[in-house]
Amino acid sequence: MTPRVWLFDLDNTLHDAGRWVFARMNGEMTRYVQQTLGVDTAEADRLRREYWQRYGSTLLGLMRHHGVRAAHFLHETHRFEGLEQNVLGHRHDLAAIARLRGRRVVLTNAPRAYALRVLGALRATTLFDEVIAIEDMTMFHQLRPKPDRRMLRHVAQRLGVAPHQCVLVEDAPENLRAAREIGMPGVWMQRFARRGAHAGPRVARWSQRLAGVRVVRGLARLDALR
């Protein structure tokens, strides 16, 4: 059965965020932690990494332990002067997305303004029916970004489909694992993965833990999925 809804991650799925964006994002987050908490650069970087590892998001750790407001954090850490000139996608991937039947939705832990800038730079805004950004991931007064399973169920419900009628296309295996646990099929996008010495074993290890998740180097064959 052809999926009724395609859910696409943004960074490192639709474009190569590792090429320019992530280094600047990490720097901006470290600077934000330093200025907000009044700590030195080394401690700020340590906290950024610790919260990301513990909660899946630096923001969640800052909200939980330091009362940081999400809107302020997202605005200050995602401004990125020169972003549009440094967004690099792949034309074959975008052409493949255009061929897909069913609704096409961007599902990103990034803020909406940033997501729209990236899509605009890719000339891909019209390819998608909707953008679900981190601002849309609050449930019961708590922010629940990917890989929160409750949020993924809520997204499917909001779109009027069951989880098994969606396909999540992602570069992050932890998000794909959460999707699988609620019955949502997944595609692990590898085009923009950084190929270090341990990349092969990492892919093999996660592939074993993600039974049923298809691993692809590009999106050209998505329309063949059933």
Sequence positions of predicted segments:
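Asp-based, Mg2+/Mn2+-dependent phosphohydrolase catalytic module
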Residues: 1-4, 98, 111-112, 116-226
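N-terminal helical cap/lid subdomain that shapes the substrate entry/recognition surface
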Residues: 2-93, 113
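Hydrophobic residues in well-ordered beta-strands that form the structural core
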Residues: 16, 106-108, 188
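Short glycine/serine/threonine/alanine-rich loop segments
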Residues: 39, 68, 102, 161, ...
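Short helix-to-loop capping/linker segments positioned immediately adjacent to catalytic or ligand/cofactor-binding
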Residues: 85, 104-106, 140
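Residue-level marker of regulatory loop/turn positions in helix-turn-helix DNA-binding domains and
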Residues: 89, 107, 144
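Catalytic-core regions built around general acid/base machinery
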Residues: 92-101
